[in-house]
């Protein structure tokens, strides 16, 4: 383990040169795979409009329903896990460029965005052409609700008022689904739309059918973090996450599961990052709500590569820990955090060092904030890794991922799309 200041700029050498301009442009955050998938859905709808024009009202309705169904179903937990299973089934002898692209599977939310926007546009066209009074009233009510959901899902509102975004998305989504049923029944569109709506409704309801309140044992090694332990009959796979709540109709928060090999149950590392996490750490509740199934997360893509580097800051160590413990893929850890033993406790730090004796741990309380792009690159180069996985805050994650990818190094990190 390295706890002293890492090597100087002279020792590390220069970062690799930037990719040529055309390739570098494709690595820009605005052209990330999430946005490409959203654009693909929108362009596919535009192509359909061009090829099928003019469109009859039933076709407009079917197009709206198909796109809105896409927006809902791609967020279903079983579908998400299927996406990851398919993408990570590629063997490591496949070309790196192919595996690099498959590793972006967690950008599937672009399909959600594209489907929601296209579906709303199709439904607007349908409503404008609807002559029926009651049907038109339901249509405009549904459009107003869809517009509210889309507006509050935009990053400026979602990032500042995430609790309100979550409530509007949940209750607005349920209300929109009820209105869609009403509209479909009034319009008499036949069995196919009803079958699609039934699938969408089941997709929405399924996680709530598994809603339950479970016991939790919580340790607080410092005022900054809580370690929550669960053992209610489920041992999740490494790289998955669990959503928990203290009030199921209000806020839900997802955290990376940390199962221990050979033991039942799992842990969550909960860092103080807002009112909800702060009250959880202060109160140490004995029971919380869970729903649905555990869902695959970004670090699951590690199996696509022969060696990976994990870059974490602060409580970002939580999502990395299950992969470090499972050791399915050779890995090297770079962890920057303030006073790790005082913040997270000796037991957790010793557990990390037992499986990562060569980890580079930068104590920010002693050495200040490091250049994480350079640290990530040095570990990638020295370890002979094929990819870097960064778990940190939004600003630093984008800085590391973009800083490496525009130099031709596969890099991955959360995209904060929910």
List the model feature ranges, each with a label.
Residues 1-418:
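FNR-like FAD-binding dehydrogenase module
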């Amino acid at each position: 383990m390295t706890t002293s200041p890492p090597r100087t700029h002279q020792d590390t050498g220069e970062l690799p040169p930037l990719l040529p301009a055309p390739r570098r442009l494709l690595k820009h955050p605005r052209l990330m795979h999430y946005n490409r998938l959203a654009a693909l859905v929108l362009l596919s709808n535009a192509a359909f409009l061009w090829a099928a024009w003019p469109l009859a009202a039933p076709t407009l309705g079917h197009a709206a329903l198909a796109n809105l169904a896409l927006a809902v179903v791609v967020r279903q937990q079983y579908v998400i896990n299927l996406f990851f299973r398919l993408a990570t089934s590629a063997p490591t002898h496949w070309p790196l460029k192919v595996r690099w692209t498959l590793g972006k599977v967690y950008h599937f939310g672009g399909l959600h965005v594209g489907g929601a926007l296209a579906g709303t546009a199709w439904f607007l066209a349908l409503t404008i052409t609807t002559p029926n009074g009651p049907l038109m009233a339901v249509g405009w009510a549904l459009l107003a609700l869809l517009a509210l959901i889309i507006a509050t899902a935009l990053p400026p509102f979602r990032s500042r008022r995430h609790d309100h975004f979550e409530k509007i998305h949940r209750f607005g989504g349920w209300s929109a689904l009820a209105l869609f049923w009403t509209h479909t029944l009034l319009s008499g569109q036949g069995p196919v739309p009803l079958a699609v709506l039934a699938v969408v409704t089941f997709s929405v309801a399924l996680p709530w059918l598994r809603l339950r309140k479970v016991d939790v044992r919580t340790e607080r090694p410092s005022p900054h973090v809580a370690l929550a332990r669960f053992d209610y009959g489920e041992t999740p796979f490494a790289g998955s996450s669990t959503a928990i709540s203290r009030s199921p109709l209000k806020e839900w928060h997802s955290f990376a599961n940390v199962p221990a090999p050979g033991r039942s149950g799992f842990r969550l590392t909960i860092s103080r990052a807002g009112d909800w996490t702060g009250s959880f750490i202060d109160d140490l509740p004995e029971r919380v709500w869970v729903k649905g199934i555990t869902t695959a997360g970004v670090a699951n893509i590690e199996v696509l590569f022969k060696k990976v580097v994990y870059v974490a800051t602060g409580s970002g160590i939580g999502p990395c820990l299950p992969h470090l413990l499972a050791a399915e893929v050779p890995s090297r850890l770079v962890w920057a955090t303030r006073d790790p033993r005082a913040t997270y406790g000796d037991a957790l730090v010793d557990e990390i060092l037992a499986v990562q004796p060569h980890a580079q741990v930068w104590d920010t309380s002693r050495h200040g904030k490091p250049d994480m792009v350079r640290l990530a690159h040095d570990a990638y180069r020295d370890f002979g890794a094929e990819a870097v996985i960064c778990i940190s805050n939004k600003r630093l994650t984008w800085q590391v991922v973009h800083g490496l990818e525009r130099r031709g190094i596969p890099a991955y990190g959360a995209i904060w799309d929910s």
